[in-house]
Amino acid sequence: MSKVSGSNGGDSKNTLYCSFCGKSQHEVRKLIAGPTVFICDECVELCMDIIREENKTSMVKSRDGVPTPQEIIKVLDEYVIGQQQAKRILSVAVHNHYKRLAHAAKSSDVELAKSNIMLVGPTGCGKTYLAQTLARIIDVPFTMADATTLTEAGYVGEDVENIILKLLQAADYNVERAQRGIVYIDEVDKISRKSDNPSITRDVSGEGVQQALLKIMEGTVASVPPQGGRKHPQQEFLQVDTTNILFICGGAFAGLDKIISARGEKTSIGFGATVRAPEDRRVGEVLRELEPEDLVKFGLIPEFIGRLPVLATLEDLDEDALIQILSEPKNALVKQYQRLFEMEDVELNFHEDALREIARRAIVRKTGARGLRSIMEKILLDTMFELPTLEGVREVVISEEVVKGTARPLYIYSERSEEKTNVSA
């Protein structure tokens, strides 16, 4: 196939048009010629999106109608960079959970218990995003709760039944669908016991919340009002069985690496023991050695940890991983901003050293991947403010100096590029 791109001048009779959307060669970046038809770059991208969606829906399923672990991890790889071990653990756990539900109707002497999941990793390493992506792959209702807002029933704050209410809302009040959903509880490290010593003051937002979560995580019939909380006691309650709801808990657990290291030091005493200074090891490397007893020392009660038998630890993201996150996934930040600029018919490009500088700044802020968007917003703010009123801008280039704040983005105008083409010709 030959590639046809025309200049803005010339006879309109010679202007070529896309056979699919009808746009002229001047309205698109590229026009590709076939034997009798033309297709523009925008239609090619649209076709690719349709094919990707169809591939996702025609995902290979196991005999139980549940996506296989290999298929789950394949889709996760498209959206989440790195964290291979965590993705492997999650794909197996989710596959087994929904396989268990597929066989629940069949009579068996062996009752398969539910395996809820605990995700442990630094801030911004992808815990929440992994849980959201899993729910999309399996196509089940998903809701997220912040553990810091939860309190025991009867106290000011959100009670745990509100989590089930949110899931029901995500399922459009379809109780059957809600009972097969996924609940992600974030910041569970913030509900650790405040102290090992008993106190006359009740710990309603720490151990009290852990106790309240035990029942719904293990499986109970929760009475949920359709329209929110404890404020309308006269309303008819909906009965939601939480037995088959998959609970995924996540937290950064700041300081947990020190507890693990201290335990490791006790076990590595003696001749021939390899000793590495704690400061030589990254947080993610230390977290790989996590045991349930470490979470007990951190402040989670043993009964709560017992309801979360699958432990997955995530690595802290280094510079290279953050650069990949910026540019490689399907909905990478760079691609998102490029799409925004395309709406103004402007091409946005980043130098490699600019992406590296953005990654460095996120590491300094200690916000992981979560901090990348705020950095990008700051860099592109003035450009996005000016662009709608500027005429003739064809391309915007972001260099390392722009990220550092020592230079402005480079604007390339279509008139200039045409003049250069005419001169060289």
From Swiss-Prot:
GO terms for molecular function: ATP binding; ATP hydrolysis activity; ATP-dependent protein folding chaperone; protein dimerization activity; unfolded protein binding; zinc ion binding. The keyword Amino-acid biosynthesis does not apply. PANTHER family: ATP-DEPENDENT CLP PROTEASE ATP-BINDING SUBUNIT CLPX-LIKE, MITOCHONDRIAL, ATP-DEPENDENT CLP PROTEASE ATP-BINDING SUBUNIT CLPX-LIKE, MITOCHONDRIAL-RELATED. This is ATP-dependent Clp protease ATP-binding subunit ClpX. NCBIfam families: clpX (TIGR00382), PRK05342.1 (NF003745). GO terms for cellular component: HslUV protease complex. The keyword Cell membrane does not apply. It comes from Sinorhizobium medicae (strain WSM419) (Ensifer medicae). The gene is clpX. Signal peptide: none annotated. Zn(2+) binds at residues 18, 21, 40, 43.
